[in-house]
Amino acid sequence: MLSQIAICIWVESTAILQDCQRALSADRYQLQVCESGEMLLEYAQTHRDQIDCLILVAANPSFRAVVQQLCFEGVVVPAIVVGDRDSEDPDEPAKEQLYHSAELHLGIHQLEQLPYQVDAALAEFLRLAPVETMADHIMLMGANHDPELSSQQRDLAQRLQERLGYLGVYYKRDPDRFLRNLPAYESQKLHQAMQTSYREIVLSYFSPNSNLNQSIDNFVNMAFFADVPVTKVVEIHMELMDEFAKKLRVEGRSEDILLDYRLTLIDVIAHLCEMYRRSIPRET
């Protein structure tokens, strides 16, 4: 049986909170909701050893100031940043590091992915710890990096490994979240989420200045932690290409352009293979 994951959510929108609670309703998650930046800072200071993962909504007031204060106070934990306050579309995932170098980004419309992205955030933090924080950039790009903070991060990583059973991210995957073990309704929801995520990858694949890498990472995280077979990924790709082909035929245009998107499929599968490679525990 997997240990509970303690998640602290800083959210000031009732609608977003409800979406988060719906996605993380399983007994596996213990949620602490902070309705303001002040509440978050107070809770993080008094319960820093009881937070496994932070979910931070970028549209919250004083977001950057609060996150900066977390860094300066040495509260650096696995994190997911939702939305992007500096974008023309604040619902989209952020395009830059806002808290630390191991944070993951989700759009507000992608919150159904949270069960898989929480696992991914924990795994990424453990892989990169000690991570570079926003405070490091402020202090001359890390020239004055606090060694005590690095030590605290390593201690947190060790605590997570011991309590949650991380030897490699493969061993942390929750079998109850595997595609083959999901109830029919949940399986359909996952399939739809992956279709939507893959569509975003395809539509932005050849666009400059897109958030492509984050989109691919989000899709691969879902595929990996749900133990989705590569054949299913290929199926999702082919379904989308068939849909696009029908539209092109209706418009009287050539379907040859779709051949270029074979690169998209190869890229996504390569990322998934890399995720599996990294999951193999290092020999001791």
Curated annotation (Swiss-Prot):
Residues 1-164 form the KaiA N-terminal domain. Changing D119G: Extends the period of the circadian rhythm to 26 hours. Changing E239G: Extends the period of the circadian rhythm to 28 hours. Changing D136V: Extends the period of the circadian rhythm to 30 hours. Induction: Transcribed in a circadian rhythm with maximal expression at 12 hours and minimal expression 12 hours later; has its own promoter. Protein levels are fairly constant (at protein level). Rapidly forms aggregates in the presence of oxidized (but not reduced) quinone analog DBMIB (2,5-dibromo-3-methyl-6-isopropyl-p-benzoquinone), an artifical electron acceptor for photosystem II that reduces the plastoquinone pool (at protein level). Aggregation is irreversible, and prevents KaiA from stimulating phosphorylation of KaiC. Binding of oxidized quinones (produced as darkness falls) prevents KaiA from stimulating KaiC autophosphorylation. GO terms for molecular function: identical protein binding. Changing E274K: In kaiA3; induces an arrhythmic phenotype. Changing C53S: Induces an arrhythmic phenotype. Disulfide bonds: none annotated. Disruption phenotype: Not essential for growth on low light, loss of circadian cycle and rhythmicity. 'Kai' means 'cycle' in Japanese. The homodimer has swapped domains; the N-terminus of one monomer interacts with the C-terminus of the other. Key component of the KaiABC oscillator complex, which constitutes the main circadian regulator in cyanobacteria. Complex composition changes during the circadian cycle to control KaiC phosphorylation. KaiA stimulates KaiC autophosphorylation, while KaiB sequesters KaiA, leading to KaiC autodephosphorylation. KaiA binding to the KaiC CII domain during the subjective day yields KaiA(2-4):KaiC(6) complexes which stimulate KaiC autophosphorylation. A KaiA dimer is sufficient to enhance KaiC hexamer phosphorylation. Circadian oscillations can be generated in vitro by incubating KaiA, KaiB and KaiC with 1 mM ATP. The cycle is self-sustainable for at least 3 cycles and resistant to temperature changes. A very robust clock is reconstituted with KaiA, KaiB, KaiC, SasA, CikA and RpaA; output is measured by transcription from an appropriate reporter. Belongs to the KaiA family. This is Circadian clock oscillator protein KaiA. It comes from Synechococcus elongatus (strain ATCC 33912 / PCC 7942 / FACHB-805). The gene is kaiA.
